[in-house]
């Protein structure tokens, strides 16, 4: 009897529970998102929101970490938020492997590639949809596509600027993966002069 009970329990646990799968209300399936111009506009707005976040140009790549690394201002240890002061001090002293600066640098790297992945999804799908799905026809479709390409180029350039040496140092060295497609593969690494 115990054997049957164990086997029955195993069968119940091993079966699929599709009725438990709930799609969150604040998410949308990729196939649904990229079927209308409205979906493409929403996806592009999501890219702009992420670019404007504190992790990128909302702080770290504008007045925050990057300004401290460029020594555009002096740090005052009497300020509130000692952790942010330590990050600024280490960045100004070019100490990029400290416990305060490493998480910021890693966040910049990961967030930029995450945004590039989202942009690549837009580029991947935009040619598969007819211009009639866009409120302003082909002009809007071309505008969204052009913005996506421009944003991807800007983000790759900033990654190169931040994480690769100057071209005069080693023009043929490869330092960063260049991502043109969405997916788990690393991507081709280009030289700084490519």
Model-predicted regions and their roles:
Residues 1-26:
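Bacterial Sec-dependent N-terminal signal peptides
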Residues 84-163, 190-193:
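Conserved, well-structured interaction surfaces
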